[in-house]
Amino acid sequence: MEMTNAQRLILSNQYKMMTMLDPTNAERYRRLQTIIERGYGLQMRELDREFGELKEETCRTIIDIMEMYHALHVSWTNLKDAQTIDERRVTFLGFDAATEARYLGYVRFMVNVEGRYTHFDAGTHGFNAQTPMWEKYQRMLNVWHSCPRQYHLSSNEINQIINA
């Protein structure tokens, strides 16, 4: 992260104020203040992660994935032979915290802050699928988008989507 000396001074002062306002996280803010004041390049890269960016297209794709899982679950609930498909297969798992943290953070934001998809079960790991899911979800979306009635899926269509 490139910053001018003036920007570093402003951010350093912000961390100093946060130390006073939030004593429970004071040590963390003091550490960040030191990194900013001294310009430690390697550690300043941590700020890049904190101030990351998720493009609009990516956000829309994540919402589309969540909407697909909503449609899968609604369709599964309406099936007469729902027992043939395990409910866990139509339950949104989330994203891998280790490799897809930005996506996971957006899912948590959508559910916990925006109040969308609150009916999704976060499980004990808070939507951490613990395995990379992005590519799997992309394949599933391709199949889902090709279905003529995306919210009234047949058993066969549900199986095609979850097995993509």
From Swiss-Prot:
This is UPF0304 protein CKO_00501. InterPro entries: UPF0304_YfbU, YfbU_alpha-helical_sf, YfbU_helix-hairpin_sf. Belongs to the UPF0304 family. SUPFAM superfamilies: YfbU-like. It comes from Citrobacter koseri (strain ATCC BAA-895 / CDC 4225-83 / SGSC4696). HAMAP family: UPF0304. It holds the Pfam family YfbU. The lineage of its organism: Bacteria, Pseudomonadati, Pseudomonadota, Gammaproteobacteria, Enterobacterales.
